Amino acid sequence: MNFPLIRQQPWYPGQMGVPGSDVSRGLRTQPNGIVLFVDGNHPNATTTADGTDPNNPLSTITAAMAKLVAFHALSEVQAEGSTIVIAPGTYTDSIAIDRTSYPPDCSIIGCGNSKFDVVWVPAAGDALSIDQSGWLIDGIHFQPAADGAGVKLTWNAGAGAEDTIIQNCFFDGRWGTGLYGVEFEGAPANCTIQDCRFAEFDTAQPCITITATPTASPYQTHILRNTFQEAVEYITIEAGGFNASIIAGNHFVQATGDLGATTTYINLGTGSLGYNQVVGNYFDGDYSNTGGYTAETNGNDNWVGNFAADVAEAEVGDNGITVAEPAA
């Protein structure tokens, strides 16, 4: 029997009679890397499954990461560009991605929706700690543990989680249960947090924070188009500060008080450079230092062009547009 040779897009499976159209490493968008499927609810799922077939998936994220590490050790650099695809369900893994065992430039993709999402809720510690470059995290509902972050990004020895992208995720503090949404430790550069939702973090449990600066402060962090609500602290620092970063297009909402009033909307701390751009955001509450808005201490940030509800401040025009950094 002759089968037609049909040209199709890369995301279609291989076809009978088309040499080379099927591969043993899963559906991929580039020639290197591997695609591994995780589905804790699938009847065929096990921790020892092949994982490259969605009908023979791995049951845990931990098992998928072990497969990726083994593949990387076997093929060296060809593991770059790998993807972990996670089906809807609740996962309790705690993953630490290091620079030695894991390849750079890989993706973790949650394939859920508003009704059935991918919930990542570790029993303890960080859900995901990254010390490797270029990873993409997309579509995950993080519920951090009481002693960890949803995602922790590190840079402690001259290299680390630079170029990380976190997008389309929900960081859910569960009314004060989770410790941090996204935690920076050290100075990972060029990290992007975009189109995410942060909510329900309590006092000393900020949505985004820097906890330590053993090398330097984060550089060129982009925090774009996120929503922050029902939390006491949104973007703040426990050490250091942000440098040459852009915070744009975000929506900061004053908490209703179920946990407590919002005390910190943005505190950019004390970086080594400053030069942050805080533009095009919506600011609720009191636009002042006492109200929870604090520029980086070098005095060279740009906070012009935000929408603020507090038109009584001298730093806010009568039209609600900020014209200067927040003051005391």
Which positions does each model-derived feature cover?
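Solenoidal tandem-repeat scaffolds enriched in leucines and small polar residues
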Residues: 170-231, 235-238, 242, 247, ...
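Right-handed parallel beta-helix/beta-spiral solenoid domain characteristic of secreted/periplasmic
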Residues: 94, 103-152, 173-175, 201-202
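Short, T/G/N/S-enriched strand-turn elements that build extracellular solenoid repeat scaffolds
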Residues: 62-77, 91-101, 126-130, 152-156, ...
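Extracellular beta-strand solenoids
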Residues: 18, 38, 86, 93, ...
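Parallel beta-helix/beta-solenoid
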Residues: 79, 100-104, 123, 132-133, ...
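Glycine-rich repeat segments that build the extracellular carbohydrate-interaction surface of secreted
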Residues: 36-41, 59-92, 106-112
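Right-handed parallel beta-helix/beta-solenoid
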Residues: 2-63, 307-311, 327-328
